C-alpha cells in the first residue's frame, strides 16, 4: 500500500498489511492556521487521545492532506 507521509506529504510504500492514517488536532494556533495534520502508515489504526481525530484507510494514497475551508 502507498500512503502519504508527513512532513513532506510524499507518497511512500508501506509494509504489507499496514493502513494509512490522517490524524488532526488543534493546538494554540488552530484559529489562525487550522488544525495540525499528521499523515502516515501503521500496522493498525492508531488509538488517539480525546480531542484528536483519526481516519484510517487501506487503499493507495487514500490519506491526502486535508483541504481547509477559507472564509
Swiss-Prot record:
Keywords, alphabetical: Acetylcholine receptor inhibiting toxin, Disulfide bond, Ion channel impairing toxin, Neurotoxin, Postsynaptic neurotoxin, Secreted, Toxin
Signal peptide (residue range): none
UniProt xrefs under SUPFAM superfamilies: Snake toxin-like (SSF57302)
Pfam families: Toxin_cobra-type
Record has Methyltransferase as a keyword: no
Localization per Swiss-Prot or TrEMBL: Secreted
InterPro entries documented for this protein: Snake_3FTx, Snake_toxin-like_sf, Snake_toxin_con_site, Toxin_cobra-type
Gene3D superfamilies named in the record: CD59
GO molecular function, one term: ion channel regulator activity
The UniProt record lists the keyword Protein transport: no
CDD domains (UniProt xref): TFP_snake_toxin (cd00206)
Any single Gene Ontology cellular-component annotation: extracellular region
Domain of life where this protein originates: Eukaryota
Major location (coarse): secreted
Tissues expressing this chain: Expressed by the venom gland.
Cystine connections: 3-20, 14-41, 26-30, 45-56, 57-62
Entry similarity comment: Belongs to the three-finger toxin family. Long-chain subfamily. Type II alpha-neurotoxin sub-subfamily.
Function recorded in the entry: Binds with high affinity to muscular (alpha-1-beta-1-gamma-delta/CHRNA1-CHRNB1-CHRNG-CHRND) and neuronal (alpha-7/CHRNA7) nicotinic acetylcholine receptor (nAChR) and inhibits acetylcholine from binding to the receptor, thereby impairing neuromuscular and neuronal transmission. Ranges of nAChR inhibition are in nanomolar (competitive binding with alpha-bungarotoxin gives Ki=2.17 nM on muscle nAChR and Ki=26.9 nM on alpha-7).
Name this protein carries in UniProt: Long neurotoxin 2
Species name: Naja melanoleuca
Taxonomic lineage of the native organism: Eukaryota, Metazoa, Chordata, Craniata, Vertebrata
Amino acid at each position: 500500500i502507498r500512503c502519504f507521509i508527513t512532513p513532506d506529504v510524499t507518497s511512500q510504500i508501506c509494509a504489507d498489511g499496514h493502513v494509512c492514517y490522517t490524524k488532526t488536532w488543534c493546538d494554540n494556533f488552530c484559529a489562525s492556521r487550522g488544525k495540525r495534520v499528521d499523515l502516515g502508515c501503521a500496522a493498525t489504526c492508531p488509538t488517539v487521545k480525546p480531542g484528536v481525530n483519526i481516519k484510517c484507510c487501506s487503499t493507495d494514497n487514500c490519506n491526502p492532506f486535508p483541504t481547509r475551508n477559507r472564509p
